[in-house]
Design a protein with these regions (language model features):
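Conserved N-terminal phosphate-binding loop of PLP-dependent enzymes in the Aspartate aminotransferase
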Residues: 41-552
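Long, low-complexity, intrinsically disordered segments
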Residues: 561-589
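Charged, low-complexity interaction regions
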Residues: 15-17, 33
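N-terminal amphipathic/basic helix or basic patch
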Residues: 2, 6, 16, 91, ...
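Charge-rich, solvent-exposed alpha-helical interaction surfaces
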Residues: 3-10, 20, 24-27, 35-39, ...
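Charged/polar low-complexity intrinsically disordered segments, enriched in acidic residues
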Residues: 4, 8, 551-559
Length: 589
């Protein structure tokens, strides 16, 4: 999480008082102040829209989650009871989590961390993973729905992967030169996805970074279009946010504006934004898209993406489909096969890597040739015909990961009779059965949430699902639900993405449903949800929205700079006033 996102999270979850929020705001660089104001405005409108879209009768659904500032002594007492219980059941994990901090730098350790829940939020230390289950060093067993962030389609340590890796280890794993798994894995990858050539990288982030380099090399253009809400890894080349003027801005510490300047950030599914692509086509090398965003799985704008494909073909722009999570999940040839929208390039990395650190780029030969110059014959006068873009990596064709990939692809092909460029259906692909189980589980839980009138839904696509808390998306109750699920035997992921796998039995799924319901019922019993005055809060939201002015983009007009500064000062005062209103009236933005 970047500094600016951390501040926003503190404000929207009401973890800080208004004076502290203002102090943070004043210390921000000017571009991040713009970003923060823009995001606060967006969050206000989105919060209202989410509730209205998911609950048609607001009068019958008036429960709200308490915020961290609203926790009373009874809430704190219950949290303390749970902390004591967890310390009794997982003492070794807590001790090891504390020991690790001194030397191990963990970027995930503070994800979702709440001061009120800190005693409950240490990471578990696992002793093993097997099938659908994780076991910690205190001998506790958990149903795993984190699925190693989407890697484990077949669960932990399936026999066919263990056998393939073991055989490769016995032969050694030379990193220079080819091994027999290389040609087999790339051929099978191409057959299953319908792409012509394949490149292995060392991570998903690296795959996306190289795909962008290929797009720029092929088109001799610089700009890359990305969409708000997407996640494409941690390369500076794809990390930018959009300010209130629609300009791309660097997202946080260590990220420079020059990288953000080469990105165009648009709204995914907004047909009007296609005009921006058309108007700036001469600058744009590629459009990078998660066809179904892992952070927003309910947003599935098929018609929009079809128009993007049509436009990119017309304008000499590469369409890069990031199927890091959806690839080999929704069906063998991913969302591209399901929606019949093929990218020029596509990136992969989780399922086909089989748990090994890897990424893949696949695509049309004419573009993939920018990596190695193209195919030539060793026995004639032919030579590489395309000028190469610089790419390298010691572990790109590591034989251990290739053995794992080959075993995964072989298993998928064995279980799915769908042929190349054919869409999976319920009669031909084992993945459809898994997708249906996920749908049924999520729909049962969504019905439960509606009956209980809690502001929570599960959004899902294929076997991916996410818990979305509607009124306080980053709040203490959200994290407490996950803590209680863990304490009752279901492990989730700090990223928020959850998955069912082939290894989950019907009994496991029933247990997941039971434990989620139990966790919500516990928080209802302990008054972590309360009845709100929805009419009064609607009026407050409307007043706040009308109070915040629209600021024209005056960045290129020096004479108007003082006007902009005056307006920023007014916004600054409005933020203070808004925060005061939110806290006094207990409104969650």
């Amino acid at each position: 999480m970047t500094v600016i996102d951390d501040i926003l999270e503190k404000i929207v979850s009401k973890k800080i008082e208004k004076k502290e929020a203002l102090k943070f705001f004043e210390e921000l660089p000017e571009n991040e102040k713009n970003y923060m104001v823009s995001k606060l405005k967006t969050h206000l409108s989105n919060s209202v829209n989410m509730v209205e879209n998911n609950f048609s009768d607001k009068k019958d659904n008036t429960l709200k989650a308490v915020t961290e500032l609203q926790l009373n002594e009874e809430h704190k007492g219950f949290i303390d009871q749970m902390a004591q219980k967890l310390e009794r059941t997982a003492p070794k994990s807590k001790e090891n989590a504390s020991k690790c901090q001194e030397y191990f730098v963990d970027q995930r350790r503070t994800g979702g961390l709440k001061k009120a829940l800190k005693r409950l939020q240490f990471h578990l230390t696992y002793s093993k993973g097997d099938g659908a289950y994780l076991y910690d060093i205190d001998d506790n067993k958990y149903i795993d729905i984190a699925s190693d962030n989407g890697v484990n389609l077949f669960g932990h340590q399936p026999a066919f992967i263990k056998e393939a890796i073991s055989k490769r280890l016995d032969k050694g794993y030379p990193l220079v030169g080819y091994t027999e798994e290389l040609s087999q894995a790339t051929k099978l990858f191409s057959e299953l996805t319908g792409h012509e050539r394949v490149l292995f990288t060392q991570s998903g982030t690296e795959a996306v970074m190289w795909a962008i380099r290929i797009a720029r090399a092929a088109t001799q253009k610089k700009k890359i279009v990305i969409f708000e809400g997407a996640y494409h890894g941690l390369s500076d080349t794809v990390l930018a946010a959009k300010d209130q003027f629609g300009n791309s801005i660097a997202m946080g510490l260590g990220m420079i504006q020059e990288f953000a300047d080469e990105l165009i950030v648009l709204d995914y599914g907004n047909m009007d934004d296609l005009n921006i692509i058309e108007d700036r086509a001469d600058e744009i090398a590629g459009v990078l898209v998660e066809p179904v965003q892992s952070r927003n799985p309910a947003n599935q704008p098929i018609d929009f993406l079809k128009e993007v494909r049509k436009l990119t073909l017309e304008k000499n722009i590469l369409l890069v489909m990031d199927e890091m999570i959806t690839g080999f999940r929704v069906c063998c040839n991913g969302v591209q096969g399901l929606w019949k929208i093929k990218g020029d390039l596509a990136t992969y990395g989780k399922i086909p890597a089989g748990g090994m650190p890897s990424g893949m780029i696949a695509g049309l030969t004419k573009y993939m040739n920018y990596v190695d110059g193209g195919v030539f014959d060793y026995d004639d006068n032919s030579m590489p015909s395309v000028k190469k873009a610089l790419m390298a990596g010691t572990h790109t064709r590591n034989p251990i990961k290739l053995a794992s990939t080959l075993s995964i692809l072989t298993e998928i092909k064995k279980r799915c009779s769908t042929s190349e460029n054919e869409t999976c259906d319920s009669n031909s692909c084992f993945l459809q059965e898994l997708n249906e189980k996920t749908r049924l589980m999520c729909e049962e839980l969504n019905s439960f949430f509606k009956v209980k009138k809690v502001p929570l839904i599960i959004e899902y696509f294929s076997s991916l699902f996410r818990f979305k808390f509607l009124d306080d998306p980053n709040g203490v109750v959200k994290e407490f639900v996950f803590v209680l699920m863990r304490m009752n035997g279901v492990e989730t992921s700090p990223s928020g993405n959850c998955f069912l796998t082939v290894a989950h039995s019907d009994k496991d799924i029933k247990s997941i449903i039971r434990i989620v319901k139990k966790s919500i019922d516990t928080l209802l019993k302990e008054n972590f949800f309360y009845v709100s005055d929805s009419i009064e809060e609607d009026e407050i939201e409307e007043n706040i929205q009308s109070a915040i002015p629209d600021i024209p983009d005056m960045r290129n007009d020096p004479e108007q700079e003082s006007i902009k500064n005056d307006q920023m000062e007014k916004l600054r005062k409005l933020i203070i006033s808004d925060l005061n209103n939110f806290q006094e009236k207990e409104v969650t933005i």
